[in-house]
Regions:
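Sec-dependent bacterial lipoprotein signal peptides
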Residues: 1-21
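OB-fold and OB-like single-stranded nucleic-acid-recognition modules
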Residues: 21-165
Length: 165
């Protein structure tokens, strides 16, 4: 029978490898089933809840003490990343405390955030009237662009033969 102490290095290595695959953003404690469109129709659905929403930034601006992002929402996948191939779930306004560099949080970037809905706000999308739920952001993750992903160093571990082009 193998010595339990001899298995410890293998277990530690396995834990490090599995942990390296995890997302940097944890939304487990937040409710991601309620869409912004549902909350725009009935704000009570979001009362006393931490919400997780994500999507594509469609507008952004810095205000005196916070940054406002208008986001077209999409359902979140198991990693908390917006699934942009799914049907959008409406738009929302995210208010992030403090200053965000809008060059980084530009139109088209993908974000996931958690927070609480504080109100709904009447506005417009183009000429069409629209009701936006307003999310007070607690945590936010800016997903890497395809270019950033392509330039990220890749680490491969294993035994075998491979070809890199």
């Amino acid at each position: 029978m193998p010595n339990p102490k001899s298995r410890m290095p293998v277990l530690l290595l396995a834990a490090l490898l599995v942990g390296g695959c995890a997302t940097h953003f944890d939304i487990d404690a937040a409710d991601d089933r309620i869409t912004p469109q549902q909350v725009a129709n009935d704000i009570k659905l979001a009362q006393n809840k931490t919400i997780a929403w994500g999507g594509t930034i469609v507008a952004s601006k810095n205000l005196a003490n916070q940054t406002q992002l208008e986001v077209l929402s999409y359902p979140l996948d198991k990693n908390g990343r917006p699934d942009r191939e799914a049907k959008p779930g409406g738009r929302f306004i995210a208010l992030h405390p403090g200053y965000l560099e809008l060059a980084n949080y530009a139109i088209g970037r993908v974000v996931t955030m958690t927070g609480t809905v504080t109100e709904t706000r009447a506005g417009a999308v183009g000429e069409a009237p629209y009701v936006f739920p307003v999310l007070a952001v607690k945590t936010m993750f800016l997903w890497p662009t395809a270019e950033e992903e392509a330039n990220k160093p890749q680490f491969h571990f294993g035994v075998g033969v491979g070809i890199v082009r």
